Amino acid sequence: MLEIEIVYGLPDRQVLKTMQLAEGTTVRAAALQSGLDGIFEDLNLHSAPLGIFGKAVKDDTPLRDGDRIEVYRPLLIDPKEARRKRVQNQEE
């Protein structure tokens, strides 16, 4: 058995859940089993980007004992555009 954590957060609420899973479980399968979509109704675990310890991973990545799966939210603005706006605001 593997013991992993899965985390998801919004600005006002974060959830960290510990799970016991069978060897060979993939990152997407674990996310779907987590039940986080029952806590956050706008969360779609079938398509949400996933990562392990801050690094994006493919859906079929097998988990290792102690992994922390992170469920990422979609970007609200392109990072390059956000930087341009910050620089523009500083110049004004």
Swiss-Prot record:
It comes from the Bacteria. Gene3D superfamilies: RnfH-like. Pfam families: Ub-RnfH. InterPro entries: Mopterin_synth/thiamin_S_b (IPR016155), RnfH (IPR005346), RnfH_sf (IPR037021). SUPFAM superfamilies: MoaD/ThiS. HAMAP family: UPF0125_RnfH. Belongs to the UPF0125 (RnfH) family. PANTHER family: UPF0125 PROTEIN RATB (PTHR37483:SF1). This is UPF0125 protein NMB0796.
